[in-house]
Design a protein with these regions (language model features):
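Short, flexible loop segments at the rims of nucleotide/cofactor-binding pockets, characterized by
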Residues: 1-5, 48-51, 74-77, 186-189
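An N-terminal, well-structured beta->alpha segment
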Residues: 1-18
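Short acidic active-site motifs
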Residues: 8-12, 57-61, 197-198
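Glycine-rich phosphate-binding loops that contact phosphosugars or nucleotide phosphates
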Residues: 22-28, 32-140, 144-149
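Internal alpha/beta core interface subdomains
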Residues: 142-144, 149-163
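Tandem CBS (Bateman) regulatory domains
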Residues: 156-185, 219-238
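The conserved cystathionine-beta-synthase
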Residues: 188-206, 231
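Short hydrophobic beta-strand segments in globular cytosolic domains
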Residues: 213, 218-219
Length: 238
């Protein structure tokens, strides 16, 4: 795998980086699913991308492909019929085609403008049938491509935050204290409030404490523990 990332890989990174369009991933079966993941990784790290199912493409979805887009077609064998049907239309449209395959001598390998070689000696499947090793290698190649472009684009954590506002990653990068606060739920009493008013405010807001305000500024804090200690020391409280 390491040996397959060389000069052509650098050319592919530059081709995508300099492109004015998006990256369109295509494939079928398990290779198609890997294409979806690579498209998602590219999009979330600063390189606009989408996934186009090879079968759907020849049934109308080619309309989402622009001439300026770069195509990455994924097929272990390089001879999937759906890929063979699709590639001529993409070439006719003027798109640059990058083939990701374990078979450089295949249809895809020969028809591609650039090749991402993903060599596989044997699948992890005991019968050497189910795509396992091959899809892992494809995934690694896709991640290498995404991270290289991310670095080249100068993509920073603040950029990631803008397009990933949800989830734990989004919260870590994007969430601020102000996003979690609700002024209507903050317990607050004036400095002239009675003890009963303080107790009612703490009970209503259920935070175990209340801030004390004076002239619009916080002048103190009263907790339920403070109230208990006052009650223990004083018999007559108003």
């Amino acid at each position: 795998m390491e040996e397959s990332i060389g000069f052509d890989f650098e050319q592919i990174v530059q081709l995508i980086h300099q492109s004015q369009g998006k990256v369109v991933l295509t494939g079928v079966g398990k290779s198609g699913i890997i294409g979806m993941k690579i498209a998602a990784s590219l999009s979330s790290t600063g390189t606009p991308a989408l996934y186009l199912h090879a079968t759907d493409a020849t049934h109308g979805d080619l309309g989402m492909v622009e001439k300026k887009d770069v195509i990455i077609a994924i097929s272990k064998s390089g001879n999937s019929q759906e890929i063979k049907d699709l590639i001529p239309f993409l070439k006719n449209n003027g798109n640059k085609v990058i083939g990701m395959t374990a078979n450089p001598d295949s249809f895809l390998g020969k028809q591609s403008d650039h090749l991402l070689f993903t060599p596989v000696e044997k699948e992890a499947c005991p019968h050497n049938l189910a795509p396992t090793t091959s899809t892992t290698v494809q995934l690694v190649m896709g991640d290498a491509l995404a991270m290289s472009l991310m670095d080249l684009n100068g993509f920073q954590p603040q950029d990631f935050a803008q397009i990933h506002p949800s989830g734990s990653l989004g919260k870590k990068l994007h969430l601020k204290v102000v996003d979690l606060t609700d002024d209507s739920k903050i317990p607050s009493v004036s400095i002239e409030a009675s003890l009963k008013e303080v107790i009612c405010e703490i009970s209503e807001k259920r935070l175990g404490a209340t801030v004390v305000e004076y002239n619009g500024k916080i002048s103190g804090l009263v907790t339920d523990g403070d109230i208990r200690r006052v009650l223990e020391k004083n018999e007559n409280i108003s």
